[in-house]
């Protein structure tokens, strides 16, 4: 039983070898006499008995190729059924593990687990069904069709059996060329276009929005509806406050720059633009240490910084009064609020359209919690609003609700809560930078000179 997995890969290759080994018959149809191999006409018209015999022999030959391919797939199905019967579902370890002799400097390991065994069985079931369903519909390039089918079976099984990441990637990408040819040659309408589509889609060549990583000013990624370009924002000096925020983050205490990673914390999306009614702003990510969109902010292993005084050397001293704030209408535990914001909350600095400013934009600090538009989530957002006694709940799209706090006065209540009940995940770094940004806004140091 030690070679069952190798048999799954070798049997289709043997079938390909047999199909390639049998050459087409050569027919020399002449019109001399019966002794020289000629055939007399069998009926009216231009059809001769020799041509009829040639067609019959060719059909028999093509059926012979199809039978070889079908028998090959059936043999593979039998082997996969044996593996399935002998598979021990009581363990989560790889089974039937086999290693090949060393090839150059690389070893090949095969094995199946409780998940891949079903894909192996499904592949070996689909292949004979595919051959039967196209037994009479494929009338040209029969040998090429059968060889591609058997080659695809080998590559698919290799994807599910190999235990090496590199070989998994190689076999997975190797499926694309034969699949491209199979669809392009034997597909129905628009087969060429379909083959290109599946090839490009699988290669994942979709155009992605570039994330600028060259300077701190690139914290501003894109304005909603692409009405304002990043370069224009930079030349107009509209991102000065964001640059200051980044500099403060770089020079902050080492807790913000630690590389330790906390597991089990839900990660949120941090890039992209957003809009709410007539509010259009650039979604900015406050990243500790580096101005890179989408990078995780790591949690300090030594615990959160002091909530009463945080010193940023050479820039600002930010002192806050730690106060407990609980609205009498709310029954939520303060630590529940903190934990919930750790998972679902968001601290943002945005550029809001405003005609009151020369640049046409106003720097806005926003705290929000987004949930799905369900009765249960709406009730929870109402309880959070009652807890703080501030903020509004709005619809955001067709499926989302948002609890939002924007004014500096109301944000002081938010800051007081998280100073008294600090965040413990990597989102605490977001909060600290958000807090520094509010100080800049209060001191009007964010304005363009």
UniProtKB/Swiss-Prot annotation:
Keyword Mitochondrion: yes
Recorded GO MF terms: endonuclease activity; NADH dehydrogenase (ubiquinone) activity; ubiquinone binding
Gene3D superfamilies: Homing endonucleases (3.10.28.10)
Record GO cellular component, one term: mitochondrion
Record key words, sorted: Mitochondrion
UniProt entry tagged with the keyword DNA-binding: no
PANTHER family: NADH-UBIQUINONE OXIDOREDUCTASE CHAIN 4
Protein name: Uncharacterized 50.9 kDa protein in ND4 intron 1
Source organism: Podospora anserina (strain S / ATCC MYA-4624 / DSM 980 / FGSC 10383) (Pleurage anserina)
């Amino acid at each position: 039983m030690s070679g069952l997995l190798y048999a799954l890969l070798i049997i289709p290759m043997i079938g390909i070898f047999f199909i390639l080994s049998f050459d087409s018959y050569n027919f020399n149809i002449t019109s001399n006499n019966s002794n020289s191999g000629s055939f007399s006409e069998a009926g009216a018209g231009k059809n001769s008995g020799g041509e009829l015999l040639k067609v019959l022999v060719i059909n028999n030959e093509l059926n012979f190729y199809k039978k070889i391919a079908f028998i090959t797939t059936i043999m593979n199905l039998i082997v996969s059924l044996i593996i399935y019967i002998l598979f021990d579902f009581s363990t989560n370890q790889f089974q039937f593990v086999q290693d090949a002799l060393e090839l150059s400097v690389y070893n090949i390991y095969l094995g199946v687990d409780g998940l891949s065994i079903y894909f192996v069985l499904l592949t070996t079931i689909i292949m004979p069904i595919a051959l039967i369903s196209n037994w009479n519909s494929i009338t040209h390039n029969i040998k090429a069709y059968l060889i591609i089918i058997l080659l695809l079976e080998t590559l698919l099984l290799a994807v599910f059996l190999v235990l090496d990441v590199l070989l998994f990637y190689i076999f997975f990408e190797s499926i694309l060329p034969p699949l491209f040819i199979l669809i392009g040659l034997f597909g129905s309408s628009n087969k060429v276009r379909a083959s290109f589509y599946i090839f490009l889609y699988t290669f994942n060549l979709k155009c992605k929005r570039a994330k600028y990583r060259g300077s701190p000013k690139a914290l501003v990624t894109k304005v909603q509806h692409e009405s304002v370009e990043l370069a224009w924002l930079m030349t107009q000096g509209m991102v000065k406050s964001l640059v200051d925020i980044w500099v403060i983050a770089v020079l902050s205490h080492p807790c913000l720059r630690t590389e330790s990673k906390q597991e089990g914390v839900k990660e949120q999306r941090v890039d992209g633009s957003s809009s709410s009614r007539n509010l259009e702003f650039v979604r900015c990510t406050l990243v500790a240490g580096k101005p890179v969109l989408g990078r995780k902010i790591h949690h300090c292993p030594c615990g959160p910084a002091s909530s009463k005084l945080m010193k940023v050397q050479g820039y600002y001293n930010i002192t806050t009064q730690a106060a407990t704030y609980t609205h009498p209408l709310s029954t939520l535990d303060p630590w529940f609020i903190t934990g919930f914001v750790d998972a679902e909350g968001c601290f943002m600095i945005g550029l809001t359209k405003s005609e009151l400013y020369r640049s046409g934009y106003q720097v806005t600090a926003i705290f929000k919690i987004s949930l799905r538009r369900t009765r249960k989530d709406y009730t929870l957002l109402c309880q959070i609003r009652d807890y703080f006694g501030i903020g509004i709940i709005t619809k955001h799209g067709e499926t989302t609700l948002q609890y939002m706090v924007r004014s500096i006065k109301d944000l002081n209540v938010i800051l007081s809560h998280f100073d008294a009940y600090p965040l413990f995940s990597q989102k605490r770094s977001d909060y600290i930078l958000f807090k520094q940004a509010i100080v800049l806004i209060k001191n009007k140091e964010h304005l363009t000179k």
